[in-house]
């Protein structure tokens, strides 16, 4: 079977790898010069199934209003003048209730836990290296109210069988020794020992090389213009004015998926939520993290690679604007210096990327009303966490194999206005 995968971020490359491993003849098309050159390039480096939590949560509307007036706020909304932005925010607000939160978190956890298992199996099979560590995630709380609020998430962790440890302020240094210097600023934390870390860019490029050895044909610097439709099937994809054909097609264009599918009348509710990161060389290892921490107050993750610290976070709704905002830069610097001042800020690199976010925070993985078009997009902040599981899942769906986990609620069908099958 011939399959064309559109997109060479971590989701597209993982999809191609698993398809090829199961015998498909795969071609990957991308406008960039290589794999992982956009959203997968500089993310926070966390592989954290336990923190697969919907942004659309009870209390978020109130918090969003409060953040509008807060310095170093984790969320910024810049109206871009489009009706689509307002519609997407309205859809998200509809999910900010306990019932929707529970449904969406279960779906996210299902994919994320499966994905971690797939990653471990892949690592065992291939020996792939990407500055990976398996030392867990530590969520940090600066306020007692945060410690109390986390009980809701702990109940879900228990239901899903996820190992965790709730720590008081004095116990944080046992997990992250460098936090002994910031103990007076923290009241406690939630430690998930089974989470992992790694450089998504290194992983994606290494996996692409492995996929090439399996026969995957990567074509970069391609202007992927449109899908050619005939009835209820895709007949080809127009690239640089020419039409390439396959038996089946997988769309993994991230934030650009929605606009690409507009001519097909598939209304994909994926909005680009802008995030930022710093990559900092380590000069004082004793003041650097061992694994990854998540500052609950500022919604910023600080992750250890081999000789670098990756600091990522923020959420900015401003359309496809890729400008670097110095206020966000200052926030990332402030949180890093506050907790782990072991890097050389003078040598730090500042980056931004667009996360493909759905209003319910759950990715869109599965079939469409077109018999041979499949979607693997909308992973939001969790593309790295969910990549391998999503790739394996979509490969099984495309090839009509039995899936390892339930696909309930993951396809575009959950959005009735999308005309999905």
From Swiss-Prot:
The lineage of its organism: Bacteria, Pseudomonadati, Pseudomonadota, Gammaproteobacteria, Moraxellales. PANTHER family: D-AMINO ACID DEHYDROGENASE (PTHR13847:SF280), SARCOSINE DEHYDROGENASE-RELATED (PTHR13847). Oxidative deamination of D-amino acids. FAD binds at residues 3-17. NCBIfam families: PRK00711.1 (NF001933). The keyword Oxidoreductase applies. Pfam families: DAO (PF01266). This is D-amino acid dehydrogenase. Its cofactor is FAD. Keywords: FAD, Flavoprotein, Oxidoreductase. InterPro entries: DadA, FAD-dep_OxRdtase, FAD/NAD-bd_sf. It is an enzyme of class 1 (oxidoreductase). GO terms for cellular component: cytoplasm; plasma membrane. Pathway: Amino-acid degradation; D-alanine degradation; NH(3) and pyruvate from D-alanine: step 1/1. It catalyses: a D-alpha-amino acid + A + H2O = a 2-oxocarboxylate + AH2 + NH4(+). One of its GO terms (molecular function) is D-amino-acid dehydrogenase activity. Its EC number is 1.4.99.-. GO terms for biological process: D-alanine catabolic process. Belongs to the DadA oxidoreductase family.
